[in-house]
Every structure is written in C-alpha cells, then in structure tokens.
C-alpha cells in the first residue's frame, strides 16, 4: 500500500508542476498542446497509418526534467473470447486520436479486478507505455519485462522517474499472466507461451514505431526481473527471436534454467482447471477448450490461486522447441549480457516455505535442520538427491544438520534457497553463454545494498517470520523504478544503479563493471561502491561466510 501512496504522491507533484509549465510547453514544438481541461498534452502519429496517440507529461525524480508519457498504447487485439490463450493478433489501426493519458487495464489478477468491467474489457490489457524526453532524438530504448511470478505485474507498477533522468526511452509492455496467459494443451487453440508471444509482438511494435517517440530501434535493450528474467532469457535462447529485435539484455534474478521457470505438465494442469470449473468431459479436447475459453475471468482466477504458471517447452509457436539446456548448445547471438541476483535472493522462497510448513506442522522447530532443508530440496524435484547432499555438505556444519538449532541454520537456509532458485540458474546462463561466445561480454553482479526499504513480506507482511529478509528478492528494483521516496544513501544507490543499467543500454558497457574473463569470474558486487571479486562461486556461500550474518536472525523471536 505504501508503494501506491508514494506513486500517487509522485503523480500529484507531476500534475502540480504540469500546471506551472503548461504555458512553456505550449510553445515548444508541434504536436504539443493542451486538452479540454487545459493540461498540456502531446500527440504522436504512429507508422503505417496505425493511428495517433495522445500523451501527457511527467517529471524526473532528481532534476525535475520534463518527459512525455504515453500510458496504455494498445499493441494487440484484446486476447478475449476466441483469441483467449492464442498468440496475440496485432492491433488494427484506429481513426482519430487515442487517449494514452493513463494506464490501460492490467492483465487480470485476482487482487486487482475491477468488478464493473466485462470480461472482454478486463482482458483488453495488451497495452504498452512509452516514456521519452525528446520525440525527435534517436535514443537507446530500454524495454522492461516485469516479474510477478508469472501471475502478476503491470506497467503501472514501474514508474519511470529515475531511469528517465538519463537520455533513454523506456518502454514497459504488458503481457498476459496467470492461467489466462500460460495454459496450454500443446494444440492450435492453446499453443502455449502466449505471454512470450505478447512480448515478441511488443518488441516488433518498438521496431515499427519507436522512432516517432525519439527512440532508436537499432539500440533496444531488454531487461526483465524474476519471472521477467525467465521471459528475457527465453527470448535469448528462442529461435523465434529475430536478430534485430534487441541488441543487449539484462536478466535480473532468475533465468529459464531455474526449475520454477518451466511448467512441466501444462496439459494436466489445464484438465485439472477444467474439472474445477465444473465442466464435464475435460478429457475431450474440444470440450476442454470450450470450457476454458468460455469461463468467466473471475472464476478462472479464483480456482487457480494455488496453481503456478510458467513457460513451457514444446509450444506450437516454436518459441521454446527444446529444453533450455538443449537450446543453449546452439546459442550464437552476440548480445552483451548483464545478469545477476540480490545477495539473499532466495529468502522469499524460505519465507513462503516457512508459511506452508507452519500451516501443516504445529511446531516447525520440532523438525531437525536436515528435515527442514529436505523440504526445500523437494521443491526443486531433483530425484537423485545430488543437490541436497552436496549443499548439505557445503552449507551446514555437521552438528547443526541433526539438531533443532534453526536459528544457527538461518544463514545456511539463505544460501541454500538463493543458490537453488536464483543464483545457480543465473550463473548457468552467464557461464554457458560466456563459454560459447567468449568475445561477447557477459557481466555478472550480486546486488548487496541494504537500505531503508525492502520487498520482504511486501504482500503478506513479515512480522511473523523468525528471520529477516536480508537483501531480498526485488530489492534491486527499488533503486531502478520510482516506487519509494528515497533519501540520502538510498538515493545515492539509486543513482548508481540507474547509471549502471542505462550506461549498459547506451553503449553496451555497464559503468564500473568488469566482464567475465572465465567461467569462474570475476563478478561485481553492487553497493554504494562497486567492487570486483574474482571467484563467482563465492556468491553461493555469501550468507554463511558473512561475519555479520547474525542480522539475518530475528532477535526478538525464536525459530
Ligand atoms: C486532460 O489531461 C489531463 C492530464 O494530462 C487528464 O487527466 C484529463 O483526463 C484530460 N482531460 C480530457 C478531457 O481529456
Ligand atoms: C489499452 O489502451 C488503450 C489506449 O489507451 C485503451 O483504448 C484501451 O481501453 C486500453 N485497455 C484498457 C482495458 O484499459
Ligand atoms: C499483484 O500486484 C499488486 C501490485 O503490486 C498487488 O497489489 C497485489 O496484491 C498482487 N496480487 C497478488 C495476487 O499477489
Ligand atoms: C532533441 O533531439 C534532437 C535530435 O538529436 C536535437 O536536435 C534537439 O536539440 C533535441 N531537443 C532537446 C530539447 O534536447
Ligand atoms: C518445539 O520443538 C522444539 C524442538 O523439539 C522444542 O524445544 C520446543 O519446546 C517446542 N515448542 C513448543 C511450543 O512445543
Ligand atoms: C515435482 O514432482 C511432483 C511429484 O512428481 C509433482 O507433482 C510436481 O508437480 C513437481 N514439481 C515441479 C516444479 O516440477
């Protein structure tokens, strides 16, 4: 809630300042004017007679530069009715001026549904937002793919006021999330990976139209975080990604090599959901399709709150025709890559595992440390037990493993969850690509700054956990998108992050970072100062090796 409050504050400041400069703007360039209520607006004509869009103004966070914003430009037809689950269809041209003054509808999420809207309106979410300072320039384009566990996320959650301090154009497309995007039966009607196809279509839109917004279509950087990292790394490996769509990539916290990044049995999932919708004959393809396609948005969302969704291998569009571990073998792109994780990127998995366990076992501490960690390995489905055996040896002292001393094990739990779910998949992506294409730079980072704000417990609160969140998953984004009011060192950190990310987008070299020279390193620790460290596998033991790791345990609460 705090985040929304801050965002509203930013918007309000924008509106006030807007009034002050309205006069100035009116006389700047053609295409700019004012709407009926006197607020300044700007018109842009798209290519190929697609139509005209009307935008307005925002202001950067630190130097109050004015930028133009076009929020909610549709790039695809609403994926509703017979288009539901199907690859996106390009938006047909419109006549007159289309208002892009506010964000379009987010793709349906159970917690954010507007009950007044019809399903067709709710599903009309394939809009993108463009932020730019100069319509006639030719600036590098940063194309952000949001995270949200493949079931959440929106353009609105990513205010541009830090990134627009630099001379770049920011594009934030929306893509389908949850069942309405990811369900598949490997058939024409439910081909799979529709959300990745949404992103591909938005990238094509950028190629066609971004020059009208002052962006250079030859200089597009994709960046994605968490589930968005899964999508961004899929685009890197996919044979369906044309070579001109983007020239650099940033993959934050996760990759398509993670076990959570691929849905192994979407067909069974589709049938399960069909049955839960109360339909009959869910084992017959046409009945199944009819059921899923005609289901009310609210019903689909309501019965899928405990399902997880993600990309699939073998979709009919050929986006991921083989396992990522196979696809990477023929990787030939020359795309500079910046990838990494937060220092304690897995602590959110520890938290949700803890919640799930506490719901089943009345006293979590009655489990031994070994039993507790086994449950985490089980989430990863490694049937050989190799992961568990090796990580038990690496991360736990022998005497702790058979004890109930969970407090002492907290740093080990941090390293274990971070390694399995985030760090190892990122390191695999980075080192496989570096090894195959040594002449293309790969930069690896560990984000280690601990500031005032955290995303720990953002959704459900964090006061009930017997541990703290550390440098939590998504905390890096606090410094890239203007969701909080940052001061002092936090603002300095934000300036550093924006400098690194945008310098990479501008010339392919992230300011102050060192590229991999071998599969062992070096890597870069991102903090108020950036430091180069030689051995990247040291990141896997970063919590247990930390002399100050006592702060990860809660002082006021027994585990
Ligand atoms: C005029 O622009 C303001 C801000 O740009 C917007 O909030 C308002 O809805 C617009 N009014 C009309 C009539 O389009
Ligand atoms: C997507 O954006 C377009 C243009 O602003 C708008 O017409 C459309 O209604 C938006 N979709 C929703 C559901 O808001
Ligand atoms: C989705 O994200 C929004 C905005 O961050 C949040 O308000 C909402 O609670 C989230 N929904 C779920 C189901 O996590
Ligand atoms: C916008 O970009 C053009 C082309 O680079 C340049 O000539 C112009 O001065 C820029 N305008 C502003 C306000 O910076
Ligand atoms: C929970 O289990 C631990 C370890 O067996 C034990 O020390 C503790 O007293 C138990 N707590 C409760 C409330 O039963
Ligand atoms: C892990 O395996 C179990 C049992 O085979 C299965 O039900 C579950 O879906 C699997 N989870 C993942 C993430 O593959």
PLM feature spans:
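Alpha/beta-hydrolase-fold catalytic nucleophile elbow
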Residues: 174, 223, 238, 250-253, ...
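Non-catalytic accessory segments of hydrolases
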Residues: 2-196, 217, 490-497, 505-514, ...
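A conserved short beta-strand
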Residues: 243-255
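Substrate-gating cap/lid region and adjacent catalytic-acid/histidine neighborhood
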Residues: 298-491, 500, 507
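Alpha/beta-hydrolase fold nucleophile elbow
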Residues: 140, 213-226
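Alpha/beta-hydrolase active-site loop
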Residues: 191-212, 268-274
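Short glycine-enriched nucleophile-adjacent loop
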Residues: 229-241
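Alpha/beta-hydrolase-fold serine-hydrolase catalytic core, especially in secreted/extracellular enzymes
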Residues: 2-6, 436-440, 450-451, 487-559
């Amino acid at each position: 809630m705090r985040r929304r409050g801050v965002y509203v504050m930013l918007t309000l400041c924008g509106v006030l300042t807007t009034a002050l400069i309205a006069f100035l703007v009116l006389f700047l360039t053609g295409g700019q004017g004012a709407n009926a209520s006197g607020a300044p607006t700007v018109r842009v004509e798209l290519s190929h007679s697609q139509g005209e869009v009307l935008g307005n103004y925002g202001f950067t966070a630190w130097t109050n530069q004015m930028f133009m914003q076009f929020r909610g430009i549709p790039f695809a037809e609403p994926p509703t009715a017979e288009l539901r689950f199907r690859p996106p269809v390009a938006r047909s041209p419109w006549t007159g001026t289309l208002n892009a003054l506010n964000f379009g509808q987010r793709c349906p999420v159970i917690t954010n549904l507007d009950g007044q809207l019809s399903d067709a309106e709710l599903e009309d979410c394939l809009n993108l937002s463009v932020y730019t300072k100069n319509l006639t320039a030719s600036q590098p384009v940063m194309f952000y793919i949001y995270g949200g566990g493949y079931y959440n996320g929106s353009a609105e959650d990513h205010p541009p006021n830090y990134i627009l301090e630099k001379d770049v154009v920011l594009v934030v497309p929306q893509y389908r999330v949850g069942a309405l995007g990811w369900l598949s039966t490997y058939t024409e009607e439910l081909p799979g990976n529709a959300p990745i196809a949404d992103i591909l279509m938005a990238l094509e839109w950028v190629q066609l139209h971004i020059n009208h917004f002052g962006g250079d279509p030859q200089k597009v950087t994709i960046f994605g975080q968490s589930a968005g990292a899964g999508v961004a790394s899929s685009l890197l490996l996919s044979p369906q990604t044309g070579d001109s769509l983007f020239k650099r990539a940033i993959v934050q916290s996760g990759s398509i090599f993670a076990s959570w990044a691929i849905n192994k049995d979407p067909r069974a999932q589709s049938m399960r959901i069909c049955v839960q919708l109360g339909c009959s004959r869910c084992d017959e393809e046409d009945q199944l399709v009819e059921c899923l396609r005609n289901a009310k948005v609210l019903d689909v969302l309501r019965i899928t709150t405990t399902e997880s969704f993600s990309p699939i291998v073998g979709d009919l569009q050929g986006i991921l025709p083989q396992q990522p571990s196979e696809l990477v073998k023929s990787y030939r792109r020359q795309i500079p890559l910046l990838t990494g994780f937060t220092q304690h990127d897995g602590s959110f998995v520890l938290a949700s595992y803890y919640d799930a366990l506490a719901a089943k076992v009345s006293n979590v501490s009655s489990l031994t440390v070994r039993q507790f960690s086994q449950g985490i390995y089980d989430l990863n489905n490694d049937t050989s037990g190799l992961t568990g055996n090796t990580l038990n040896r690496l991360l736990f002292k022998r005497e702790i493993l058979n004890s109930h001393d969970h407090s002492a094990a907290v740093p080990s739990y941090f390293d274990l969850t971070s390694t399995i779910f985030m760090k190892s998949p990122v390191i695999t992506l980075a080192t496989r690509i570096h090894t195959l294409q040594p002449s293309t730079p790969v930069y690896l980072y560990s984000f280690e700054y601990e500031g005032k704000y955290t995303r720990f417990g953002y959704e459900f609160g964090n006061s009930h956990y017997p541990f703290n969140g550390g440098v939590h998953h998504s905390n890096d984004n606090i410094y890239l998108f203007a969701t909080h009011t940052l001061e002092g060192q936090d603002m300095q950190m934000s300036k550093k992050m924006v400098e690194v990310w945008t310098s990479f987008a501008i010339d392919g070299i992230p300011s102050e970072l060192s590229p991999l020279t071998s599969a062992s390193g070096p890597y870069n620790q991102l903090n108020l100062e950036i430091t180069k460290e030689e051995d990247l596998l040291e990141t896997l033991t970063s919590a247990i090796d930390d002399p100050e790791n006592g702060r990860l345990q809660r002082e006021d609460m027994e585990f």
